[in-house]
Amino acid sequence: MHSKPPWLRAKAPTGEIFNETLNTVKLHGLHTVCEEAACPNIGECWNKRHATVMILGSVCTRACAFCNVATGIPNKLDPHEPENLAKAIKKLNLKYVVITSVDRDDLPDGGASQFIKCIEEIRKITPETTVEILTPDFLNKKGAFEAIAVASPDVYNHNIEMVPRLYARIRPRARYFHSLYLLKMVKQINPKLLTKSGLMVGLGETKEEVLQVMDDLRSAEVDFITIGQYLQPTPKHAKIDRYVTPEEFEHYKYIAYSKGFLVVASSPLTRSSYHAEEDFNRLKACR
């Protein structure tokens, strides 16, 4: 694997609030994408009491070549997960929470009903908390993402992940145009929803391909785009083609704003839920 340039070196996770967040997550039996995906921002986010909770278990039914989450045969759903999640959010006094999940192709609805139960439980136990959901694509799960849109989270996030040319090699079980369709439809079903999508760079894409993804997302009326550097989790994962410079990320940000996105987060360490609360407040101010 390539050695990381200096702009990608994050501080090691330490601190009293970090440990408190970790203990609360473990106490309530929660999984976080911060841990499972080895996110470089875990120290900064957890010290701000920001965490992205991963529901539907910790085992994914897919094996995308960029992702560090375990794959295999998942366990049964935990019926207490929505309540435990809401209690943990209340204990941590989170004003903003991001809920994501593994892919559950084994479930009839892909786990959509569990997302809805989590939204409802949070609204009941800690109604002041803003809820962002980051869902899988629910491919071939009729009515799944539509039902979540009706449940009215504050933000509906679904990552496009990469330019379409790379799908066959890196995420062969996903479909680029299905993801665009999902993003377009949730906005049509619930026009009040703020929609968001994320793109990784450094996998071999061209600038022209990145700009085309921006155009596709704007055609789907996506409000907010995140662009970040792909980092290879282990030697067995997809290789990094190159490290995109901070200056190039700034250029992408400028172009994305010129194309009509309300909020753009574009930097080497940007991830889907990095600074999510601050960006949500900016997004509301733009509307």
From Swiss-Prot:
SMART domains per record: Elp3
Binding positions ([4Fe-4S] cluster 2): C60, C64, C67
Cellular component terms (Gene Ontology): cytoplasm
Known EC number: 2.8.1.8
Pathway: Protein modification; protein lipoylation via endogenous pathway; protein N(6)-(lipoyl)lysine from octanoyl-[acyl-carrier-protein]: step 2/2
Binding site for [4Fe-4S] cluster 1: C34, C39, C45, S273
Entry's localization field: Cytoplasm
Matches recorded under InterPro entries: Aldolase_TIM, Elp3/MiaA/NifB-like_rSAM, LIAS_N, Lipoyl_synth, rSAM
Catalytic activity: [[Fe-S] cluster scaffold protein carrying a second [4Fe-4S](2+) cluster] + N(6)-octanoyl-L-lysyl-[protein] + 2 oxidized [2Fe-2S]-[ferredoxin] + 2 S-adenosyl-L-methionine + 4 H(+) = [[Fe-S] cluster scaffold protein] + N(6)-[(R)-dihydrolipoyl]-L-lysyl-[protein] + 4 Fe(3+) + 2 hydrogen sulfide + 2 5'-deoxyadenosine + 2 L-methionine + 2 reduced [2Fe-2S]-[ferredoxin]
Cofactor section: [4Fe-4S] cluster
Family classification: Belongs to the radical SAM superfamily. Lipoyl synthase family.
Protein name: Lipoyl synthase
